[in-house]
Amino acid sequence: MTTKRKAYVRPMPSTWWKKLPFYRFYMLREGTAVPAVWFSLELMYGVFALKHGPETWADFVGFLQNPVVLILNLIVLAAALLHTKTWFELAPKAANIIVKGEKMGPEPVIKGLWAVTAVVTAVVLFVALFW
Protein backbone atom coordinates (compact mmCIF):
# COMPACT_ATOMS: atom_id res chain seq x y z
CA MET A 1 0.00 0.00 0.00
CA THR A 2 1.37 3.43 -0.89
CA THR A 3 0.47 6.73 0.60
CA LYS A 4 0.39 10.19 -0.90
CA ARG A 5 1.30 11.83 2.39
CA LYS A 6 4.55 13.67 2.42
CA ALA A 7 6.87 12.48 5.20
CA TYR A 8 7.86 15.09 7.75
CA VAL A 9 11.46 16.17 7.38
CA ARG A 10 12.70 18.31 10.21
CA PRO A 11 14.48 21.41 8.93
CA MET A 12 18.19 21.40 9.64
CA PRO A 13 20.17 24.62 9.31
CA SER A 14 23.56 24.47 7.62
CA THR A 15 25.18 25.71 10.83
CA TRP A 16 23.98 22.79 12.98
CA TRP A 17 27.56 21.85 13.85
CA LYS A 18 28.32 25.26 15.40
CA LYS A 19 25.97 24.76 18.35
CA LEU A 20 27.97 22.32 20.48
CA PRO A 21 31.74 22.37 21.14
CA PHE A 22 31.86 18.61 20.49
CA TYR A 23 30.54 19.09 16.96
CA ARG A 24 32.87 22.03 16.29
CA PHE A 25 35.87 19.95 17.34
CA TYR A 26 34.61 17.03 15.26
CA MET A 27 34.41 19.25 12.18
CA LEU A 28 37.88 20.62 12.89
CA ARG A 29 39.29 17.11 13.23
CA GLU A 30 37.62 15.95 10.02
CA GLY A 31 38.90 19.09 8.33
CA THR A 32 42.47 17.89 8.87
CA ALA A 33 42.00 15.89 5.68
CA VAL A 34 42.35 19.07 3.61
CA PRO A 35 45.91 19.85 4.75
CA ALA A 36 46.76 16.17 4.24
CA VAL A 37 45.78 16.55 0.58
CA TRP A 38 48.12 19.55 0.28
CA PHE A 39 50.98 17.55 1.80
CA SER A 40 50.30 14.60 -0.52
CA LEU A 41 50.41 16.85 -3.60
CA GLU A 42 53.59 18.51 -2.34
CA LEU A 43 55.20 15.13 -1.72
CA MET A 44 54.30 13.91 -5.22
CA TYR A 45 55.76 17.12 -6.68
CA GLY A 46 58.97 16.44 -4.76
CA VAL A 47 59.19 12.83 -5.97
CA PHE A 48 58.72 13.87 -9.60
CA ALA A 49 61.24 16.70 -9.15
CA LEU A 50 63.75 14.21 -7.75
CA LYS A 51 63.15 11.93 -10.72
CA HIS A 52 63.72 14.65 -13.33
CA GLY A 53 67.15 15.79 -12.24
CA PRO A 54 69.06 18.39 -10.25
CA GLU A 55 67.55 21.45 -11.95
CA THR A 56 64.00 20.35 -11.22
CA TRP A 57 64.99 19.42 -7.68
CA ALA A 58 66.48 22.90 -7.18
CA ASP A 59 63.17 24.38 -8.38
CA PHE A 60 61.33 22.22 -5.85
CA VAL A 61 63.61 23.33 -3.02
CA GLY A 62 63.01 26.94 -4.07
CA PHE A 63 59.28 26.24 -4.00
CA LEU A 64 59.58 24.89 -0.46
CA GLN A 65 61.42 28.03 0.64
CA ASN A 66 58.55 30.29 -0.42
CA PRO A 67 57.09 31.94 2.74
CA VAL A 68 53.52 31.02 1.75
CA VAL A 69 54.52 27.37 1.38
CA LEU A 70 56.31 27.47 4.73
CA ILE A 71 53.17 28.81 6.42
CA LEU A 72 51.03 26.18 4.68
CA ASN A 73 53.42 23.47 5.86
CA LEU A 74 53.20 24.74 9.45
CA ILE A 75 49.41 24.52 9.17
CA VAL A 76 49.76 20.98 7.81
CA LEU A 77 52.03 20.07 10.73
CA ALA A 78 49.53 21.45 13.25
CA ALA A 79 46.69 19.55 11.56
CA ALA A 80 48.72 16.33 11.56
CA LEU A 81 49.54 16.73 15.26
CA LEU A 82 45.87 17.36 16.09
CA HIS A 83 44.84 14.30 14.10
CA THR A 84 47.54 12.20 15.77
CA LYS A 85 46.48 13.39 19.22
CA THR A 86 42.85 12.43 18.63
CA TRP A 87 43.80 9.00 17.29
CA PHE A 88 46.15 8.33 20.19
CA GLU A 89 43.35 9.22 22.60
CA LEU A 90 41.03 6.86 20.74
CA ALA A 91 43.41 3.88 20.74
CA PRO A 92 42.97 2.92 24.43
CA LYS A 93 39.20 2.88 23.96
CA ALA A 94 39.54 0.29 21.20
CA ALA A 95 41.62 -2.16 23.22
CA ASN A 96 40.96 -3.47 26.69
CA ILE A 97 44.35 -4.12 28.26
CA ILE A 98 44.19 -6.07 31.50
CA VAL A 99 47.23 -6.18 33.78
CA LYS A 100 47.07 -8.29 36.95
CA GLY A 101 43.31 -8.58 36.72
CA GLU A 102 42.66 -4.83 36.38
CA LYS A 103 41.90 -2.79 33.31
CA MET A 104 44.72 -0.42 32.47
CA GLY A 105 43.85 3.26 32.16
CA PRO A 106 44.34 5.16 28.92
CA GLU A 107 47.33 7.25 30.08
CA PRO A 108 50.08 4.60 29.71
CA VAL A 109 48.89 3.68 26.22
CA ILE A 110 48.73 7.30 25.08
CA LYS A 111 52.15 8.10 26.57
CA GLY A 112 53.57 4.95 24.98
CA LEU A 113 52.27 5.93 21.56
CA TRP A 114 53.76 9.42 21.89
CA ALA A 115 57.07 7.88 23.04
CA VAL A 116 57.17 5.57 20.02
CA THR A 117 56.37 8.53 17.77
CA ALA A 118 59.19 10.58 19.30
CA VAL A 119 61.72 7.74 19.00
CA VAL A 120 60.82 6.98 15.38
CA THR A 121 60.97 10.69 14.52
CA ALA A 122 64.39 11.03 16.16
CA VAL A 123 65.73 7.97 14.32
CA VAL A 124 64.42 9.18 10.95
CA LEU A 125 65.89 12.66 11.53
CA PHE A 126 69.24 11.18 12.57
CA VAL A 127 69.38 8.96 9.49
CA ALA A 128 68.31 11.82 7.20
CA LEU A 129 70.77 14.34 8.62
CA PHE A 130 73.85 12.33 9.59
CA TRP A 131 73.90 9.04 7.69
Curated annotation (Swiss-Prot):
It is found in: Cell inner membrane. Its main location: membrane. Gene3D superfamilies: Fumarate reductase/succinate dehydrogenase, transmembrane subunit. Keywords: Cell inner membrane, Cell membrane, Membrane, Transmembrane, Transmembrane helix. This is Fumarate reductase subunit C. The keyword Cell inner membrane applies. Signal peptide: none annotated. GO terms for molecular function: succinate dehydrogenase activity. It comes from the Bacteria. Belongs to the FrdC family. Part of an enzyme complex containing four subunits: a flavoprotein (FrdA), an iron-sulfur protein (FrdB), and two hydrophobic anchor proteins (FrdC and FrdD). It comes from Enterobacter sp. (strain 638). The keyword Transmembrane applies. One of its GO terms (cellular component) is plasma membrane. It is a multi-pass membrane protein. Two distinct, membrane-bound, FAD-containing enzymes are responsible for the catalysis of fumarate and succinate interconversion; fumarate reductase is used in anaerobic growth, and succinate dehydrogenase is used in aerobic growth. Anchors the catalytic components of the fumarate reductase complex to the cell inner membrane, binds quinones.
